[in-house]
Every structure is written in structure tokens, then in C-alpha cells.
């Protein structure tokens, strides 16, 4: 069957073509049965991995030096295990990207990226040349599709033009690490970070001291 079609708002042009014998009529109503077919939408950035602890300027007066004690801790704040294969970690201090291998971060667990993995058993070797700035840097975690999963810009001072901008100070060579207070809240706010109560070096690979039910202090 040869059909000629003329557009409603057009000149004298005609469109010529053939009917497909398998064509079906358009139906404006559709029904679906999830028992037969269903899909589940997942946002491409739904991975709930957060930068949870940063030891960017270890305290040399405690015998902890940058090349041996710098680390970044990631926390899986979701309910599913996540394979980090092909994920990237960027650090503006050195302006390069670290690529993760076939590493699975279980739900509710921690992963340490260490400048010296011998200091932290079970950690990932970040490389001795990949230092963390002692003053300010932007840390970015991207998934295999290069989408940003988490990003933090830490500082050792205050930005008068930004709310919640004063970063904790004892993590700047005072013996504490920089610990996230609430992984469900925006971790790019300085107000969501606190100096670790554990001195020196914080709590790499375990629950943050700021989130612990234990009470830290000294007896009189």
C-alpha cells in the first residue's frame, strides 16, 4: 500500500512511503503488570560513599609525620556493598587522580587511602608522592561514570563570606584528625566536622570518636 501524506501547516510538499505490515495502532492508554515486567530507577549518584575522616596535617610533636600518617577515610553510609572498581579520587594538592581497582566497600564499613599503607594495615596505597595540603585542598570522589559522589574542600581557617565556615583547628598539626560528625548531612560544611577526641591520629578504619557513645576525657 502506497500512502501520500500532507502536513497540516506546510506547502505543497508530500511525504511518500509504505505501511509496515507489523505496524500497530496508537493507543493513548497503557497498562503494566509488575509481575511480568518492571524496572527500578536508581539515580546515577545514589552511591552513598562519603569522605568521613581526613588526617591532612599529622602532629610531628607526637612523632607522626606527613609521609607516614596522612590518610583519607571513606565510609559506606548506604545499605548495599559498593564495588569501587574504576572509581576515581582527586586531590587538588597534587592535581592528579587515583584510580581504584576491584575493591568492594561493604555497607557500614570503612576504607582507608593511606600515604604509607604500612602505617595502617588493610589500607589502600595512595602513594608517598600524593600528599595532602597542610592548609587547604579539595578532595573529590567520582564513580566509574565520572559523576561526583562526594566532594569536600577542607581548610585550616575561616571564610568570612561563607556561613558555617570555621574549620576545626586541632586537626592542623595539633594531634587530632578531621572527623565527620553526621554522614547524612552535607560534609562540605565546616560545621559538620570536628577534631577527633582520639589523639594522636584519630580513628582510621573505625567509628568516629565524634559519633561514639563513649565519653572521652581525663580523671581529676
Question: Which functions belong to the PLM regions below?
Answer:
Residues 1-50, 196-220:
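Primarily marks secretory-pathway-exposed extracellular/lumenal segments that are disulfide-
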Residues 10, 42-189, 196-199, 213-214:
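Activation on beta-sandwich/Ig-like modules and their edge loops
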Amino acid at each position: 500500500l502506497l500512502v501520500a501524506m500532507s502536513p497540516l501547516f506546510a506547502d505543497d510538499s508530500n511525504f511518500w512511503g509504505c505501511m509496515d505490515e507489523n505496524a500497530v495502532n496508537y493507543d493513548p492508554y497503557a497498562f503494566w503488570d509488575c509481575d511480568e515486567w518492571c524496572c527500578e530507577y536508581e539515580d546515577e549518584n545514589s552511591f552513598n560513599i562519603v569522605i568521613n575522616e581526613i588526617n591532612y596535617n599529622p602532629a610531628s610533636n607526637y612523632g607522626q609525620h606527613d609521609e607516614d600518617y596522612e590518610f583519607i577515610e571513606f565510609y559506606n553510609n548506604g545499605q548495599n556493598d559498593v564495588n569501587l572498581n574504576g572509581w576515581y579520587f582527586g586531590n587538588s594538592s597534587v592535581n592528579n587522580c587515583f584510580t581504584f581497582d576491584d575493591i568492594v566497600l561493604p555497607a557500614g564499613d570503612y576504607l582507608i587511602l593511606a600515604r604509607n599503607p604500612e602505617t595502617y594495615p588493610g589500607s589502600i596505597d595512595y602513594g608517598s608522592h600524593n600528599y595532602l595540603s597542610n592548609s587547604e585542598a579539595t578532595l573529590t570522589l567520582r564513580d566509574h561514570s565520572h559523576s561526583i559522589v562526594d566532594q569536600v574542600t577542607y581548610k585550616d581557617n575561616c571564610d568570612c563570606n561563607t556561613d558555617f565556615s570555621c574549620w576545626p583547628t586541632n586537626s592542623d598539626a595539633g594531634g587530632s584528625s578531621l572527623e565527620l560528625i553526621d554522614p547524612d548531612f552535607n560534609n562540605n560544611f565546616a560545621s559538620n566536622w570536628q577534631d577527633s577526641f582520639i589523639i594522636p591520629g584519630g580513628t582510621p578504619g573505625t567509628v568516629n570518636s565524634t559519633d561514639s557513645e563513649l565519653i572521652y576525657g581525663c580523671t581529676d
